[in-house]
């Protein structure tokens, strides 16, 4: 099994984190997230979105999009509840991560820490920062009094949200005001089988 991957991508990290928890071996091929000139040649037949992560299964079939890959491996494991309502809640928070958190926190982090030209994005940054702060407040309010995002144990919702939340500081977001988020990040990082983003 081959994962087309970027070591700095939170979306790729989510997949690596779940595979580590499940003990599933795989090979990695690093894809440059700055220079995209060879994306069509590299991923065109595998992922119409030309994005990482892209996973090629042992039988040659491919999957793109972090959420789809997480669900493929997570469904039927302890990371997806059996209860229908809780399963839907896991999906709700995975969608929240992709529609709200990722477009704000991940984008600013990329601009600031990895683009090599953060000044080019300065006009757009305040609006993205405001959106990211709103996301962090929402997550903090939800986690207040809870150990995990859904239910009483680690699920795909936690893995999906952890990917970019734990590196939000690289984009200039402060987790200081968000005690519940900080406690949850520590809890997720202390789970058996956890691996850091740079592993």
Regions from the PLM with identified roles:
Residues 1-8, 13-126, 140:
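GST-like domain detector, emphasizing the conserved glutathione-binding G-site
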Residues 85, 97-193, 197:
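GST-like fold's C-terminal all-alpha helical module
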């Amino acid at each position: 099994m081959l994962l087309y991957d970027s070591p700095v991508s939170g979306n790729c990290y989510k997949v690596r984190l779940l595979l580590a928890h499940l003990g599933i071996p795989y090979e990695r091929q690093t894809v440059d997230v700055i220079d995209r000139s060879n994306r069509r040649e590299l991923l065109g037949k595998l992922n119409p979105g030309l994005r990482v992560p892209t996973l090629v299964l042992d039988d040659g079939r491919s999957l793109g999009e972090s959420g789809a890959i997480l669900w493929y491996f997570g469904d039927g494991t302890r990371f997806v509840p059996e209860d229908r309502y809780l399963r839907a809640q896991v999906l709700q928070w995975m969608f929240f991560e992709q529609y709200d958190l990722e477009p704000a926190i991940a984008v600013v982090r990329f601009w600031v820490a990895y683009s090599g030209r953060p000044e080019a994005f300065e006009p757009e940054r305040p609006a993205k920062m405001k959106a990211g702060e709103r996301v962090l407040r929402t997550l903090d309010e939800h986690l207040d009094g809870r150990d995990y995002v859904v239910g009483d144990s680690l699920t795909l919702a936690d893995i999906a949200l952890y990917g970019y939340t734990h590196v939000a500081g690289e984009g200039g977001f402060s987790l200081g005001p968000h005690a519940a988020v900080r406690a949850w990040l520590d809890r997720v990082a202390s789970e058996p089988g956890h691996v850091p983003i740079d592993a």
